[in-house]
Amino acid sequence: EYTAKGNLVGVISNGSAVLGLGDIGAQASRPVMEGKGVLFKRFADIDVFDVELDLEDPDELVTAVRAMEPTFGGINLEDIRAPECFEVEDRLREAMDVPVFHDDQHGTAIISGAALLNAVDVAGKSVDDLHVVFSGAGASAIATARFYTSLGVPKGNIVLCDSSGVIGTDREGLNEYKAQFASETDADTLAEAMAGADVFVGLSVGGIVSQEMVASMAANPIVFAMANPDPEIGYEDAKAARDDTVIMATGRSDYPNQVNNVLGFPFIFRGALDVRATEINEEMKRAAAEALADL
């Protein structure tokens, strides 16, 4: 009430997983973090300090961020690689009395979740019957898969694929986060997994989905090809792959139906700061997705 803390968010990164650039380090990540601050201010009038930490050890990251709690009304974690990002966020949420939100995870989950809620209506499908295939098994994919289950998608109907193919229960050496979504399936490849699927969620690399793969999906498929700067399949190619309705979205602004985190994170933090929330919980995330879907 008496200081700027109530309208101040820390955008904190170690630059280990910058979108489209990878592990470029703390210093090189600064333009991205400054840009994030501009979006916070432009859309939600939230002040931001960007903090780039030259730290890779999760223990050191947690200690450094916790020490900044007196300064910030909320913490936006950004571009921290998986699987360390899960541990870092979980520990900070437990330890801190201000909202801690890893946007690469939850921003993507919320915005694509809102898109999913509307897409099922257009496609004449039901959330609780969907079969969903993910290309990608990093922070955003795992968080989005978790969020889809909270929206009603059966966990057993979700298949995750990484660079080695389908993540099955027979795969050895999985980290605990990928193991949560290991599937009982005969499919080995992304192409095999997509056959008959209702939804494709791309959070991986460009150009890995063919028209034949889209053609193999269930009737009126939903295709969220969100890799940037190049989607897993182009908008025109996906639409031309079938004669029925293809609900197609990408992460790009030059195609229709852009799925972009900027639709969420400024306003989610605005609401959390205004009510002096101590966390951004699952109910708040679902409410944000449902509100976006209703726009």
Residue spans for each PLM region:
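Predominant activation on well-ordered alpha-helical scaffold segments within soluble catalytic domains
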Residues: E34-K41, V62, R66, F86-R93, ...
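Solvent-exposed alpha-helices and their adjacent loops that cap or buttress functional pockets
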Residues: Y2-K5, K41-R42, A67-E69, R93-E94, ...
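Adenosine-phosphate binding glycine-rich loop
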Residues: D103-D104, A123, D129, A225-L295
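N-terminal ligand-binding/catalytic initiation module
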Residues: E1-P99
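Rossmann-like adenosine-cofactor binding region
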Residues: A179-I247, R252-D254
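Glycine-rich phosphate/diphosphate-binding loop of Rossmann-like nucleotide-binding domains
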Residues: L19, I24-A44, M96, H102, ...
